[in-house]
Amino acid sequence: MYTHYLKNLISFESVTPNSAGAVEYIDGLLKQHGFKTEIKIFGDSKNERVTNLYGVFGSNEPNICFVGHVDVVPAGNHEFWHNSNPFKFHEQDGKIYGRGAVDMKGAIACFLAASLNFIKNNMDFKGSISFLITSDEEGKSTHGTKEMLQYIYDQRYKIDFAVVGEPTCEKEIGDTIKIGRRGSVNFKLNIVGLAGHVAYPHKANNPLPCLIKILNELTNIRLDEGTEFFQNSNLEVTNIDVGNDILNTIPASAEACFNIRFNSLHSVETLSQLIEQIIKQYCKEYKVDYKLEYSSSAESFVQNPNDNDKIKEFADVIERTLKIKSEFSTSGGTSDARFVKDYCSLVEFGLLSEMAHKINEYTKISDLQKLYDVYYNFLMEIF
């Protein structure tokens, strides 16, 4: 059943932020099985219009919601794929190939199969099962899950617990549950000096020595030692640009970009204050001006599994089903869980992350079965 759903989902060329019919396919499937559904399209311009779906079966508490995305990253050169078509289901040696097989159409297919089979076998269950699906997670994530969550809550829907189907596992299904994510903030620093001829440095003010000093301190600073659930925060320089092709000219300005992935010991505000304090110190010393810009896609968050019964229940289901004890993790990049956590508690749990976004992306059929079993048994446990 899940392979059938996955075959159909892969066939939609849903490169972010386009649904390409994938959201509509899920909508039709849910309607056939008695779900109340609504599709909402958010976004202003043609290139930013995002298709979102909320479908719910039942009206009682608790409401267990699967949160997922049908959009995928571009497939690259199709000639490098096994069958030269990343959007055509290809099965070989117990594996299913196709863009989105891992991230995250495989998880959607498994939760569809698990929930529909559960409802079929337990028509009188007390509670609700719902789906929140978007076509904008791999891109800007502006008009997807974030806006849809606000919309459904404005419509008086309440989610009690969410399963986000991101590919979380490392080596085998069940080894990792994400219970939080690091925050991310990007900085752009421009140091403004005074241009001049290299033969007359006293008539100029080179911005580069100041920038080098600043970057040296920033890259050597130890932001923290990590926490129980987080690794230490980390700063990486991502770009240095002078824009000067004339070798005998001192540049007028120099720019650097850097990113900080940070844990729950920090916020965007505290980090920006720390960074600016260091910059001011060196700019004063070198008598140069500066402009600092920063933007953040997410603050850090974590949910302590010791304080959340449903997270513990989910981990217990994995251990009973797959005979493996999961590690609680906050590693990796950002995901739509950063929006969901403002409304309810959650876990992120899906397939292996190794092949996500790669040429010849695939998942093992045996892994799909394991994921299906966990999802189904979790519904049995909750209801």
Curated annotation (Swiss-Prot):
Catalytic residues per the record? Answer: D71, E137
Residues reported in the UniProt entry to bind Zn(2+) 2 = D103, E138, H357
Whom does it interact with, and what assembly results?
Homodimer.
Q: Which UniProt keywords apply?
A: Amino-acid biosynthesis, Cobalt, Diaminopimelate biosynthesis, Hydrolase, Lysine biosynthesis, Metal-binding, Zinc
Q: Could you tell me which HAMAP family the record lists for this protein? A: DapE (MF_01690)
Q: InterPro entries of this UniProt entry?
A: ArgE/DapE_CS (IPR001261), Bact_exopeptidase_dim_dom (IPR036264), DapE_proteobac (IPR005941), Peptidase_M20 (IPR002933), Peptidase_M20_dimer (IPR011650), Peptidase_M20A (IPR050072)
Details of cofactor binding? Binds 2 Zn(2+) or Co(2+) ions per subunit.
Q: Which named protein is this?
A: Succinyl-diaminopimelate desuccinylase
Family of the protein in this entry: Belongs to the peptidase M20A family. DapE subfamily.
Top EC class for this record: hydrolase
Q: In which pathway does it act?
A: Amino-acid biosynthesis; L-lysine biosynthesis via DAP pathway; LL-2,6-diaminopimelate from (S)-tetrahydrodipicolinate (succinylase route): step 3/3
Is DNA-binding a UniProt keyword of this protein? no
